[in-house]
């Protein structure tokens, strides 16, 4: 089978959402996800699952959406003018996890499928996705393990995949106005279709399935680390970068808002609490300073 099959993709995505939510509930140990099913007037809908006030996770959102429309939004046709005049179908699972403990990194993952149709023409389709890690306090062990997990899931698809998608992630999750990366990266891919549907779908599944395998050990390792108000305030300050990136640069956020997507689901990635501070400068020699100097820039984490 090499023709695109959106039914197959949707079944995988719904199962992935279910498995990730179960895994996060097990990690948290107390809180449960609340599900909010929704429909979109223009076509499609989804189910948003949100966990709040947990022992480990302050907020975790895992969203499935499947939307369709008769014409493409400006955010899509700007990059792909050949899509103008086509109907479209977009589906995906997107998640963001904001832990309580500043020693546990925030993380984001997304896997998605897009297909556009036009009478008398072949469909235009592709997969996209990835995952990335945003630590507040620098633990080299965690970052190396995260990138090793990313590299391992890429290896069956070719030796060039990890370095290419790792670089793409570094470049995508970058805040030009801050001149820093959002975190320590991971994988990012888009427009994936050149290898045909089966191989492209298999890679997307590997990324989706690999997320919790990469993240759970870091949570287990850091969840009982003692912290105080100083660390909490720094975490809230650094969360501001998440807000800045998502509202100014993130293509998925812009696409969702321009297509009349569900605002609550689109903005599910926002941290529940955040703060800004004028001209913040970390204390020299501190762990906070090490984050800025050593972690918020692209690095080859596997050959240090």
From Swiss-Prot:
Disulfide bonds: none annotated. Its cofactor is a divalent metal cation. The keyword NADP does not apply. Pathway: Porphyrin-containing compound metabolism; protoporphyrin-IX biosynthesis; protoporphyrinogen-IX from coproporphyrinogen-III (O2 route): step 1/1. It catalyses: coproporphyrinogen III + O2 + 2 H(+) = protoporphyrinogen IX + 2 CO2 + 2 H2O. One of its GO terms (biological process) is protoporphyrinogen IX biosynthetic process. The active site is at residue 108. Substrate binds at residues 94, 110-112, 260-262. InterPro entries: Coprogen_oxidase_aer (IPR001260), Coprogen_oxidase_aer_sf (IPR036406), Coprogen_oxidase_CS (IPR018375). Keywords: Cytoplasm, Heme biosynthesis, Metal-binding, Oxidoreductase, Porphyrin biosynthesis. GO terms for molecular function: coproporphyrinogen oxidase activity; metal ion binding; protein homodimerization activity. Pfam families: Coprogen_oxidas. Residues 242-277 are annotated as: Important for dimerization. Its EC number is 1.3.3.3. The record marks 177 as: Important for dimerization. A divalent metal cation binds at residues 98, 108, 147, 177. Its main location: cytoplasm. SUPFAM superfamilies: Coproporphyrinogen III oxidase. It comes from the Bacteria. HAMAP family: Coprogen_oxidas. Belongs to the aerobic coproporphyrinogen-III oxidase family. Involved in the heme biosynthesis. Catalyzes the aerobic oxidative decarboxylation of propionate groups of rings A and B of coproporphyrinogen-III to yield the vinyl groups in protoporphyrinogen-IX. This is Oxygen-dependent coproporphyrinogen-III oxidase. It comes from Shewanella halifaxensis (strain HAW-EB4). The gene is hemF.
